Amino acid sequence: MEMRICLLAGDGIGPEIMEQGVRVLETVAGKFGHDMEFTDALIGGAAIDETGDPLPQETVEACKAAQAVLLGAVGGPRWDNLTGAERPEAGLLGIRKALGLFANLRPAKLFPELASACFLRPDIVANGIDVMVVRELTGGIYFGTPAGEETRDGLRTAFNTMVYNEEEVRRIARVAFEAARKRSGRVCSVDKANVLAVSRLWREIVTATHADEFPDVELSHMYVDNAAMQLVRDPSQFDVIVTGNLFGDILSDEASVITGSIGMLPSASLGAGGPGLFEPIHGSAPDIAGQNKANPLATILSTAMMLRHSFGLEKEAEAVEGAVQQVLKAGYRTGDIMDQGGTLVGCNTMGNLVNERI
């Protein structure tokens, strides 16, 4: 298979972890007989320094010409004096919009070898944590209108509007059901249908989409307040969670932090037919940039998500994930996941160790 991939290294540790991600992709290409073409482009602070714009038009065009986009990290204190659309983070928001990415897939998996990092009770951890939160990215209360502030009865009053139409719900539901087919085949749709009209429509459309298109997948529904509790009470009950923008923002962060190893977690943002964007959920860590201390595993696991979701290469994705697990089982650790008895290695060595096991 021929693959065109755009690389957005970004800022801080971005170039270091990107290097390891690319090496893994090159190893996969060599061992499985694929051809990969890489294009580099600027985003975030690096783009500001070079062009004055956190998202140059050339970057947008390069991403649109690719089949998938791999992102390192964006932002850092050297650009803290900038505001709004001038900030590095505006580049990330801009590329998501330019590519029409409406679905964010964030897996929260606890590797057994890192169980000691999890703050949940040992009996809960023993059941395993492997949750995928599918969050709608472009609708809901963050983008609904009207929104703003005005004076009512002499009082400052602010307001936002939560809005979803049936097609927005249907397309995110399809992403969740398709993801579940690649996993354990279970979807839990999270809403607040006992209070919100928008959630009642959400539940109705998710249920209909399940019946019409995905009867082989198990579907359940849960109110968001209960879901937030159940995630810490027994995360093993969940496979794929699908929910709207606001609830997904909260639940995906909750799901990621309960693993205790945020430096291990990848993510994917997908649209309708165009290139997907794959990135680690951690930040740019400027305090350790250029010191060979960064953990590249979240980026490497993001390449596995790319292979699976952009190219349909399940065997190759599993090979990458299996290699990561073997390295952890052998006791190798970067500083952020170091535990008693582990062997401390740097970013480059960790990448080498994974490559050797693919």
Curated annotation (Swiss-Prot):
Annotated function: Catalyzes the oxidation of 3-carboxy-2-hydroxy-4-methylpentanoate (3-isopropylmalate) to 3-carboxy-4-methyl-2-oxopentanoate. The product decarboxylates to 4-methyl-2 oxopentanoate.
Keywords carried by this UniProt record: Amino-acid biosynthesis, Branched-chain amino acid biosynthesis, Cytoplasm, Leucine biosynthesis, Magnesium, Manganese, Metal-binding, NAD, Oxidoreductase
Protein name: 3-isopropylmalate dehydrogenase
Compartments in which it is found: Cytoplasm
Transmembrane segments: none
GO molecular function terms attached to this record: 3-isopropylmalate dehydrogenase activity; magnesium ion binding; NAD binding
Annotated positions binding NAD(+): 76-89, 283-295
Cellular component GO terms held in the UniProt record: cytosol
Assembly and oligomerization: Homodimer.
Family from the record: Belongs to the isocitrate and isopropylmalate dehydrogenases family. LeuB type 1 subfamily.
Cofactor section: Mg(2+); Mn(2+)
